[in-house]
């Protein structure tokens, strides 16, 4: 069977870039995890061997499962019913294979169940997956939205949400609206603080949201009453388990059908602030610095 890693020697060439030694040292914090986790690398050579093996496993799953499923996934596509998205059967198989192989939350620290991968080998994994099915690549690689939560969320949010992504739950980034696309300063999805329940409530519509029925959403919303620019925006975390968001429809696209691009309706949806208020656009820039590395693959 094809292996989308070992069959492409250029990938290993890039993995062996001399800069990787310093990258590994920084990401592994001088290999401190070796005393706490038996699978953590002991040194640079051990780390590179681990990256190589994970890339080979990714290439194997891609060649044996994702690539053979790609045509059927594109023909079947996801379906929308009762406000929810049902993935194509092949997409479900792909997700299951990646979860069983432990290929989720790849860049997250080991204490949360992640692999603590540097962005370089993780991006290579994303390229391998997207080479077989760009639609599934969209769904799987959105796990890197968790980097924003890791950077700006508090310890309680880290402990509640990051292990779920490492265990295989999916993510989305809810930015675009009917009247706010590239100009995100025009976002008007309303965030109101519910004092009685000590939480935020989101109301409005998001459009063209990739993987819009994900388990966890990062949502850009207007938290400051009376504002009209970026200074009134904050980033929120929405958990699908809380309810309050329905998928109105899936966009009818020319291609990449396996990835559901959704219109979402927020109806008093419970959410929590990710980081400080009024810094939503800064968090967005942080988020896309990761997602734009993997989604174009």
What are the residue ranges of the model-derived segments?
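Conserved small/polar residues in nucleotide/adenosyl-binding loops
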Residues: 291-297
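Internal maturation/activation junctions in enzymes
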Residues: 141-142, 153-189, 193, 198
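Extended, hydrophobic alpha-helical segments in both membrane/secreted and soluble proteins
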Residues: 104, 108, 116, 121-125, ...
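Amphipathic, small/basic residue-rich leader segments at the start of a protein or domain
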Residues: 1-136, 156, 160
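A short core secondary-structure module
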Residues: 199, 203-245
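Short Gly/Pro-enriched turn/cap motifs at secondary-structure boundaries
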Residues: 179-182, 208-211, 227, 253-260
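A glycine-rich, basic-preceded beta-loop-alpha segment at the flavin cofactor/substrate interface
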Residues: 241-248, 263-290
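Flexible, glycine/threonine-enriched loop-and-boundary segments that flank and lead into catalytic domains
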Residues: 84-93, 106-107, 174-194, 205-207, ...
């Amino acid at each position: 069977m094809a292996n989308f890693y070992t069959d492409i020697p250029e990938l290993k060439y890039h993995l062996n870039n001399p800069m990787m030694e310093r990258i590994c040292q920084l990401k592994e914090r001088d290999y401190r995890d070796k005393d706490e986790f038996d699978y953590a690398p002991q040194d640079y050579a051990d780390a590179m061997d681990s990256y190589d093996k994970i890339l080979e496993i990714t290439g194997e799953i891609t060649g044996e499962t994702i690539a053979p499923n790609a045509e059927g996934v594109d023909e079947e596509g996801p379906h929308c019913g009762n406000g929810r998205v049902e993935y194509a059967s092949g997409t479900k198989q792909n997700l299951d294979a990646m979860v069983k192989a432990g290929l989720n939350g790849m860049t997250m620290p080991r204490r949360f169940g992640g692999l603590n991968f540097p962005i370089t080998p993780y991006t290579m994994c994303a390229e391998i997956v997207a080479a077989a099915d760009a639609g599934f690549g969209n769904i799987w690689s959105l796990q890197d939205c968790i980097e924003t939560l890791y950077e700006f969320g508090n310890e309680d949010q880290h402990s509640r949400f990051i292990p779920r992504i490492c265990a295989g739950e999916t993510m989305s980034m809810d930015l675009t609206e009917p009247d706010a696309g590239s100009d995100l300063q025009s976002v008007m999805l309303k965030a109101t603080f519910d004092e009685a329940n000590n939480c935020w409530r989101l109301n409005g519509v998001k459009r063209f949201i990739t993987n819009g029925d994900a388990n966890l959403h990062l949502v850009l919303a207007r938290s400051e009453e009376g504002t009209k620019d970026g200074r009134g925006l904050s980033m929120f975390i929405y958990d699908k388990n809380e309810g309050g968001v329905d998928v109105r429809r899936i966009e009818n696209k020319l291609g990449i059908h396996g990835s559901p691009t959704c219109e979402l309706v927020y109806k008093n949806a419970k959410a929590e602030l990710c980081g400080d208020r009024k810094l939503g656009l800064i968090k967005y820039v942080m988020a896309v610095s990761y997602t734009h590395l993997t989604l174009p693959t």
